[in-house]
Amino acid sequence: MWNKHGIIYSDKKAQLPVLEERNCSWRIYFTSRNKLNQNEGYFIDVEKGNPYNILAPAKQVLVPGKPGSTDSAGVMPTCKFEDKLYYIGWTIRKDVPYFNYCSVAKEKFNAKFKKRGPILSPDLIDPGFSGTICVTKLNDTYMGYYLSCNNWIPDENNKLQPSYSIRLATSDDGLNWTNIWTMSGDQG
């Protein structure tokens, strides 16, 4: 049974919270927008079991990349697993509103991350973009569940909206991935 506790941290543009359990605290990664309306990655540390007690103020951990990069329009943390922070890299396009890449950053020390880049790119299985990966481990294999954009459909206002499939990829190291399966019934 879930109990709603209300707001523990106030940021008008905070979204997509990701919890990492630590020894004596919970680290909550989240996304907020900068003055250019780009997503940036942050975290706060809160007391384990009492998230209203914020132990450390918000700290920035990911910023958008340089022009032309796969995350030039923003970054959104989606999963923290071991020493890796998985995130969505955003770009803006002319033919469709945006394009995303499942990406990874490796933790170096003291919550400093080095962006490694995209881990799932367009290919024969995922002809569109990938995003929002959630990673776990089964035996010695990393399992990454993610969304795959397979189409853009005009809505009632003729704005293009993405259509998604849920897919699974596997990896031996959490960095190099192989797409293997779709959960939504379509085959791409």
Where are these regions (language model features)?
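Beta-rich carbohydrate-recognition and catalytic domains
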Residues: 1-73, 79-128, 136-188
